[in-house]
UniProtKB/Swiss-Prot annotation:
Database matches in PANTHER family: UPF0398 PROTEIN SPR0331, UPF0398 PROTEIN YPSA
Originating organism: Streptococcus thermophilus (strain ATCC BAA-491 / LMD-9)
Protein name as it appears in the record: UPF0398 protein STER_0279
A Pfam family reported for this protein in Swiss-Prot or TrEMBL: YpsA
Similarity annotation: Belongs to the UPF0398 family.
Length: 171
């Protein structure tokens, strides 16, 4: 079994506020290209944490790829209460994260910032590699997870970058 953790920018961090935004198609095209490569290299589990934006788009692509690949999907939420205050439209996306092969949460509810560090460490310790849409120059809260991955020198990290998206756009 080879697992791939998938995470990255949230939609609002990319200035995407509608599902029909043209940026989403370009991002999904890049995701599909990359996920196929991971699948061809033997990845058979893709792990998500239930975030809107890059993760949700990757989940949509992964569900499409399940038709052609022996792929299993999992969502590991940081909290049981994850997404409970989201809008109705986003509740549908949350439901998609729950309609996978394996679903668990780490903590019943948020109590302290230390839980995020523990959750991130758990993800690194229990997955084989990560696929991350993040650039340190465009900093978000994802920087904490990114820095933990970098510190774990034996944990493979594959990044999608804005340059990659420009390449896909010009194809």
């Amino acid at each position: 079994m080879t697992s791939l953790l998938i995470t990255g920018y949230k939609s609002f961090e990319l200035g995407v506020f509608k599902d029909k935004d043209p940026k989403v198609n370009i991002i999904k095209k890049a995701i599909k290209r990359d996920l196929k490569r991971f699948l061809d290299e033997g990845v058979d589990w893709m792990i998500f944490t239930g975030n809107l934006g890059f993760e949700f788009w990757a989940l949509e692509v992964a569900k499409e790829l399940q038709k052609d690949y022996p792929l299993r999907l999992a969502t590991l939420f940081p909290f049981e209460t994850h997404g409970q205050n989201w809008s109705e439209a986003n509740q549908e996306k949350l439901a998609a994260f729950k309609q996978v092969d394996f679903v668990k949460y780490s903590f019943p509810a948020y109590q302290s910032p230390a839980q995020f560090k523990q959750f991130n460490q758990f993800l690194i310790d229990n997955t084989d590699q990560a696929y991350l849409f993040y650039e340190p120059e465009n900093e978000t809260n994802l920087k904490y997870f990114y820095n933990m991955i970098i510190a774990a020198s034996d944990y493979p990290l594959f990044r999608l970058t804005f340059d990659d998206l420009n390449e896909v756009m010009s194809e």
